[in-house]
Amino acid sequence: MGFGDFDEICKKAALPLCSLVGPSSAISGSTGIIPNCYARNIELANTIIFEGAASFLHIIALGMTVIMILHIRSKFTAVGRKEIITFFYIYMALTVCSLVIDAGVVPPRSGPFPWFVAVQNGLTSALCTSLLVNGFVGFQLYEDGTALSVWLLRLTSTVMFAVSFLISILTFKSWGGLSPTNTLAMFIVLYIINAICIAVYLVMQLLLVLNTLEDRWPLGHIAFGLLVFIAGQVIMYAFGDVICDNVQHYLDGLFFATFCNLLAVMMVYKFWDYITKEDLEFSVGIKPNNWEIKELLPDEDRRTTVYQDTNSEYAGSMYHHRASTYNGHGY
């Protein structure tokens, strides 16, 4: 195996791009590297679903992402709110694309399949780039939530999406000097650059916690997220085929990688949620009536007014004791 080749990778892991790279078959004439083992298909309502377990996890990941986005949106004044929510929007788009590919909605060997896989690769690079830029937000090098901060994140993520997408589709289609057997550029973009982005993010968050925070609990979120992410990659690329054989093709490495990636993304959310504070005066909670009066004040403690004169013709008016319920406060 040479540097940049996908031969050994695709034999261990049933990645979608594996059917688009490698030498042409002498029999069929089509490209593709067949993995040693891959999860069996399932039939549901006369429909064949590929990678059933991984596809089910993608659906769970979508639900969890929606919940995390709603919680982020509720923290109205938290630092880096707009930036981190962009990261989760990209993750949601990547999950939808992965679900479409893994479940076989766009089957391999079909015309649109290379384009969908190229989009998946592009979203992967955009996600890692978004994570990298989010790593600098906490240092307040520039004001978070401003047009500069938000568009810096969006533009860098878009650029990396375009680079990864173009290199992938050029490789799959044998355009521009690239080919399914010349995968070095795609390997560098998908593995080397993305790994650098993740590593820089981790270093920046360690510096942020150690230099600016007294609480060390956020380090636990970072450590756990890193461990599960590494575990998922090791299982998929080193032991995926072994696990697949031992469970009779019900699961493969892609299932465990998807699960571990979800946990790692959840730890990114937990870390951000833990280190961010917000001004309670302007916060918007998910639950209504964040402020409420538990009991009424005694009569002697109530605010007196000029209308307390019992001789007044308005003393018995129903408007005398009216209380406003605006924002849960009594007036």
UniProtKB/Swiss-Prot annotation:
Taxonomy of the source species: Eukaryota, Fungi, Dikarya, Ascomycota, Pezizomycotina
One biological process term in Gene Ontology: protein transport
Compartments, as annotated in UniProt: Endoplasmic reticulum membrane
Protein name: Chitin synthase export chaperone
Family: Belongs to the CHS7 family.
Record's keyword terms, sorted: Cell wall biogenesis/degradation, Endoplasmic reticulum, Membrane, Protein transport, Transmembrane, Transmembrane helix, Transport
Membrane-protein topology: Multi-pass membrane protein
Pfam annotation, one family: Chs7
Transmembrane segments: 52-72, 84-104, 113-133, 150-170, 184-204, 219-239, 249-269
GO cellular component: endoplasmic reticulum membrane
Quaternary structure (record): Interacts with chs3.
Record's function text: Chaperone required for the export of the chitin synthase chs3 from the endoplasmic reticulum.
Domain of life: Eukaryota
